[in-house]
């Protein structure tokens, strides 16, 4: 069934959208959702292995957090070559030296040129101690100029397509922080398995970095309205990131409500960074007891974020890649 943009423009409509094929892990009680049409079931809560994981500083504490997450039913681990200049991947590689790989491993590749991208992929595999990752994303698609670099004959898109053909990556995709229109264009043009976008109560993706006033911004030009419908229509895996907007949304709603907002969208998983063990425990409890927010709540929460705050968050992410 195709999904029109109009039918899911509002958060209320999104909240009512059923997650087809959703289930629960019988051993852990963790909710599982299909990653698009890949045939893979992933935990609705994913472990973000970016700056919030690296905040543990002590590798042993970081391993403890990862181990707790995995034993509690989280099976999607989200890393990137740029996180700590490879430190995130290296920590995961250290974990895998003494643990069986029983989770879905994701990394992201940044360079736009083919040669540099291939070198980074080689380094990532070495960091993990693996010959294959489950999902390889093009990291942080930007504006039109960046799109042209990605799609160039000697660009990164060709490289990750080759990685899938060579079984270095089981699946491929792209992430985007601030450019819903560009992301929608890219998703529409290419046959990808997955995409990750910034989804939170601020409904960001509306303001250009130069938009200092932040006037007239609405969710109608954000990721939910512009890019999400394309991913859903193509039955791609869809993951939410920046659920807390780097903690900028804390205070607008309780942490568990922010997680529930993301999980109430038609996503495969909400990727959350958890810099303390108690945060891991709290978010696991939220996921296992998850009930969707009501249509009214899904409308009220974005309305609580001012246009100025939304613009500020947009500008922040326009210049920021979690590292």
What are these regions (language model features)?
Residues 1-15:
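N-terminal secretory signal peptides and thylakoid transit peptides that target proteins
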Residues 19-45:
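C-terminal segment of N-terminal export signals and the immediately downstream linker at the start
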Residues 35, 47, 77, 92, ...:
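Conserved, mostly hydrophobic/aromatic
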Residues 50-59, 108-114, 250-251:
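Active-site mouth loops of central-metabolism enzymes
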Residues 78-95:
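Glycine-rich, proline-tolerant flexible connector loops at the mouths of alpha/beta enzymes
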Residues 93-106, 157-162:
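Alpha-helix-loop-beta-strand connector modules within alpha/beta enzyme cores
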Residues 112-239:
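Glycine/proline-rich, positively charged
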Residues 214-216, 222-323:
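Structured C-terminal cap/extension of enzyme domains
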């Amino acid at each position: 069934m195709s999904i029109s943009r109009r039918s899911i423009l509002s958060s209320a409509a999104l909240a009512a959208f059923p997650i087809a094929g959703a289930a629960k892990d019988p051993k852990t009680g963790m909710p599982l959702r299909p990653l698009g049409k890949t045939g893979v079931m992933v935990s609705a809560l994913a472990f973000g292995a970016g700056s919030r994981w690296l905040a543990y500083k002590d590798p042993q504490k970081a391993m403890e957090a990862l181990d707790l997450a995995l034993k509690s039913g989280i099976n999607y681990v989200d890393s990137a070559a740029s996180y700590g200049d490879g430190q995130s991947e290296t920590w995961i590689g250290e974990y895998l030296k003494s643990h069986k790989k029983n989770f879905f491993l994701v990394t992201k590749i940044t360079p736009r040129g083919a040669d540099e991208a291939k070198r980074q992929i080689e380094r990532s595999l070495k960091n993990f101690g693996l010959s294959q990752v489950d999902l390889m994303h093009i990291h942080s698609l930007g504006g039109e100029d960046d799109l042209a670099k990605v799609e160039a004959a000697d660009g990164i898109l060709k490289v990750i397509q080759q990685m899938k053909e060579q079984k270095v990556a089981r699946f491929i995709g792209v992430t985007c922080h601030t450019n819903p229109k560009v992301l929608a264009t890219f998703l529409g043009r290419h046959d990808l398995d997955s995409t990750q976008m910034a989804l939170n109560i601020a409904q960001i993706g509306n303001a250009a970095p130069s938009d200092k006033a932040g006037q007239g911004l609405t969710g109608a030009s954000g990721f939910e309205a512009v890019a999400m419908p394309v991913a859903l229509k193509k039955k791609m895996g869809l993951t939410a990131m920046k659920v807390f907007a780097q903690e900028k949304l804390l205070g607008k709603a309780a942490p568990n409500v922010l997680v529930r907002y993301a999980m109430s969208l038609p996503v495969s998983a909400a990727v959350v960074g958890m810099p303390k063990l108690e945060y891991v425990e709290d978010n696991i409890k939220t996921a296992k007891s998850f009930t969707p927010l009501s249509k009214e709540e899904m409308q009220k929460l974005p309305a609580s974020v001012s246009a100025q705050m939304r613009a500020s968050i947009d500008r922040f992410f326009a210049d920021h890649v979690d590292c």
